[in-house]
Amino acid sequence: KIVFPFVWMLIQFLVPFMIYSYCNDDCEGVGIDFLMKCRSRRLWWNSKCLWNCLTVLSVYAIQYATAFVYGLCNGNLSMKINYELFEKISNKSVPDNAANVWIIVYMLVMPVVVSLVTALVQMTISMFTNPMIGMLAVMAWNVMSVFINNPLMIGNNSMVVRSSVYNAQRIQVWQSAAVCIVVYIVVYVVGMIGFNKKDI
């Protein structure tokens, strides 16, 4: 039985809304002025990718800082898994090895890594089509991850309950890392080549 993880999905959908149309908007006005001054499409594309990364990192930094301050104010700040929160986000019970530090590391790191990948995919698709299609494409990719348990369905790699740190029979961490790295590199190269050929 598949239980739709609404809380997880809301977190995953936050980044696409933050990315939305920045790259497309920057193909006009000030962005074009910068492109003319630097005279390098590769440098321009790299600057967009850097902005993309910083936006994702900022979103998660705010989330983690908020959680830190909340825990500090309530006097229950710790690096232990919050059972109630874990079950709300994942719709799964806390594993027997909840004290395993790798579960906590996975929960903190992999959602960020996956968001970095989907943000770049979104920006690249948006550049070739339009911002709405780019945003809907990565949202659909995440939704499909709920129903298809495969590392190529990118959202699976941000779900600790589908990883080998939660259950040894599930997606291996190295598979998740490999998929994220390969997809990021391929999309980065495709985006750069596409932008070099784009008529602005």
Regions found by a protein language model. Give the residues of each.
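Junction motif at the cytosolic side of a transmembrane helix
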Residues: V182-I200
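Secretory targeting signals
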Residues: K1-Y22, N46-M127, P131, R162-C180
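Residue-level recognition of pore/gate-forming positions within transmembrane alpha-helices
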Residues: W51-N52, M139-V143, Y184
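Central hydrophobic cores of alpha-helical transmembrane segments
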Residues: N130-V146
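Transmembrane helix boundary and interhelical loop/hinge segments in multi-pass membrane proteins
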Residues: I19-K37, R41
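Cytoplasmic membrane-interface regions of multi-pass membrane proteins
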Residues: G31, N130, K197-I200
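Juxtamembrane "helix-exit" motif on the non-cytosolic side of transmembrane helices
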Residues: N149-N167
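Structural signal for membrane-spanning alpha-helices in multi-pass inner-membrane proteins
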Residues: V59, Q63, A67, G71, ...
